[in-house]
Amino acid sequence: MFSFFGDESKLPASTVMVSRMTVKKQAAARQQSSGPMAGPSKPSNVTPKHSHGSLKGTPRSASEKGTPKQGPSSSSKSTSKVKQEERIRPSTIPRTPASSSSPGRLKRKTPKVQVVESESSSGSESSDDALDSKPKRPKVTRKETGIDMTPLPGEQVVGRRVFCWDKVDMRGEWGRGWAGFVGCDEVVRGNVQGWANGGGGDGSKNLGKYRAFFPQEGFDRDGDFLPSVEVLYPAKGCREKFVLMVPSSDREFNPIGELRNTLRLILEHYIPPSHRHIFGNLAESLDISNPLSSLPSRMTTPLPNSLVTPPPDPASPSPAFAFEISATSTPAPSTERQETIADLIRKSLAPNRRDGPLFVTAIERYNSAMQAIQEDGTLQQWLDEGMNGGKGIKVREWAALVDFVHDQAYSRVVGGYSHELEHHPKHPEEVSKAISGKEDAYGELRHAFMSKIIEQTKLGPDSVFVDLGSGVGNCVLQASLQAGSRSYGFELLPVPAHCARLQVREVQRRWAMWALKGNLDVEVHEGDFRVHKEVGRRLREADVVLVNNEVFPSSLNMDLADMFLDLKEGAKIVSLKPFVPEGFRMNESNCDSFAAILRSTQHDYYRDWVSWKGEWGNYYVAVIDRSRRIKFEESMTGRASRRR
């Protein structure tokens, strides 16, 4: 038999050095073949004095090859019991019934391998470790099964309240009902009214971009008439009218696609287990990918032909935890599976049916069932007690819900300005020259990119987030809801700054419609962040600063470095160009530079994480750490004193 060390049968016997041993012989007894007390003790239980590189004990094969026997015999034919009393240190390995059984049945133990780290590797930091000076918590391993219990990225729970039914009215229109949001029909007509007007166009011309989705009579446009249905949101009494038409181009707003995903997320996150047999689930019936962000952010919504005819819903699973059902709630379903609301929606939207009347029936059933659980308090009780305010929702699922809600607002108040979000002559001359060589003068960081930043920088409800060059406010609003942070943005161009102000108002209305808890301390400012009066105060408070400086000239990056000197210890700077030169080493000539107080790491972003290109790239996270410079100054002072 070959082992790791070669032919096991030809291994020489290891030398056992024993300082003193006492052997007591007892009366001969018939050796038992099994049992915890049968057979003599193993010689390997004696702890020998040997070097660390040798094997412990004597291999069984070596004793059977004619090795001179000393002390008690290990042969299975031995007729005497031997008891060894060791005067040296006791064995560190406790004896178990298996270790005291017959030596003939013992298998050779595999020696333990000890991993020795080099001095250089023990003090090194990975790119993620460099963001936090505190050591990472070690992985927890279940001893019984050896299963690694560290959750996968996105599978951790949020751990804070994200649903706030009790604060919906406080963030509404102060008793005026739900008349403050921009409706789906206004976007389709291209004529946004009210407080958000000015971003639309000719309604009749815009309607020519849409066509009927359902082939039945009455589901096509007739003059100003648009086929539509009203859908009830989780907030009590909040309804929105969705137009039942689809765009001719993938680049246009898709009301059917948005309605479908609205229903999917409501059925997935808001329905109590006691009523899932009525509503069903649409998650498994839609062709939606499952990354950190499961919905496209600020991009075209999938066309209805992406739907497939799915199998029926499986029976609703039992809830993971108990939820008390009120006396007025719907009784439990019978053993025979009933057709759910999700079943009707799935059938009506299937490409081989496209049944408009059936879809209207399904929406009517949904509205009636949703209104019932709103009025009897079941929905509020589920969100507050059963869901514990959403503390147990997974990070990945929460990010997808945030993305969709913000995408609704973006489509309504920013989409109409897409033709104006271009390079503007108000840029400073040096910035204009740098941007003129780019294919796209205006760019946005997409939802997946910002989700990674939130995870990587550990943004939370106690954090302050500042975005220098915030555009239309996407990242500012995402940090305020997804992380619950206080968020502030500063944008130079007037059109993106105007869109940001519109989007803040629309997004906060959407939070209320979905009963979501976001941080209302959100501000977006228009002006040059180098001279704006609010920038200095917000930077001194900031925990995370984001700056998209990919097209900034070197002079502007130098101005930013001077501004960042006021950042507090431990603050993080996320940028697309580094503030620490490659190969930077602190010395007497550069110890006063901004790079001397930074710990910088490079990371990759992936395709479609930015709007201006479909390729991957690099971004950088720098942490303010003045201790490195202090240590360098102390070492320089020590050298100077020794020279004297």
Curated annotation (Swiss-Prot):
Segments for region (Disordered): 21-152
One Pfam family, short name: DOT1
Keywords: Chromatin regulator, Methyltransferase, Nucleus, Repeat, S-adenosyl-L-methionine, Transcription, Transcription regulation, Transferase
GO terms for MF: histone binding; histone H3K79 trimethyltransferase activity
UniProt note on regulation of activity: Ubiquitination of histone H2B to form H2BK123ub1 is required for efficient DOT1 methyltransferase activity on histone H3.
Species assigned in the record: Cryptococcus neoformans var. neoformans serotype D (strain B-3501A) (Filobasidiella neoformans)
GO cellular-component term (any): chromosome, telomeric region
The UniProt record lists the keyword Transport: no
Protein name, as recorded: Histone-lysine N-methyltransferase, H3 lysine-79 specific
PROSITE patterns xrefs: DOT1
Sequence ranges of Polar residues compositional bias: 93-103
UniProt-listed Enzyme Commission number(s): 2.1.1.360
Membership in a protein family: Belongs to the class I-like SAM-binding methyltransferase superfamily. DOT1 family.
Miscellaneous comment: In contrast to other lysine histone methyltransferases, it does not contain a SET domain, suggesting the existence of another mechanism for methylation of lysine residues of histones.
